């Protein structure tokens, strides 16, 4: 057993090593973190609203991004909210490009959210298990794209090389 090497697993479909810091179990049991529901009474909500504001401010500072969101129920709804935010940040475009290598369950939630906001979800093909960057660049150049969604590692467990993708997006005014 001592001769075995511990390697990083990228099996795909969410089956990979997960690390949960020991503080998490104590934190998630606290009432203010137990739900993303915000009470309607202002005097009760102030603490909740304050820590959400602090979290969002810290996330924008850490990531260098202009916008951040909090209070998401799970990864799928958080991703769908990111699609809504990309659309809202764009003044003209209402299309979001999504790689075929994104988890189908996440894609299903995104499509549901997008449908009711009249956001067009357009898929970007994959080649050999990775996002087709040529097709992505071609679709971005149309100029009507609010954002691009990729997953890392992707649904197939592959760590894609996304170098240059952010530059492509920014050159075409997409998030």
Regions found by a protein language model. Give the residues of each.
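Short, flexible micro-motifs
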Residues: 15, 67, 160
């Amino acid at each position: 057993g001592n001769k075995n090497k511990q390697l990083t697993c990228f099996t795909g479909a969410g089956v990979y090593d997960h690390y949960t810091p020991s503080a998490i179990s104590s934190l998630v049991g606290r009432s203010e973190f137990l739900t993303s529901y915000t009470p309607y009474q202002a005097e009760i909500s102030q603490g909740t609203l304050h820590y959400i504001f602090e979290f969002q401010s810290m996330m924008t500072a850490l990531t260098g991004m202009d916008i951040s969101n909090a209070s998401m129920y799970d990864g799928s709804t958080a991703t769908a909210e990111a699609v809504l935010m990309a659309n809202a940040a764009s003044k003209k475009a209402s299309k979001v490009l999504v790689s075929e290598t994104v988890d189908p369950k996440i894609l299903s939630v995104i499509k549901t959210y997008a449908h009711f906001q009249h956001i067009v979800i357009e898929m970007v093909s994959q080649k050999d298990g990775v996002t087709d960057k040529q097709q992505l660049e071609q679709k971005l150049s149309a100029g009507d794209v609010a954002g691009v969604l990729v997953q890392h590692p992707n649904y197939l467990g592959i760590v894609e090389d996304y170098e240059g993708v952010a530059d492509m997006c920014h050159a075409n005014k997409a998030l």
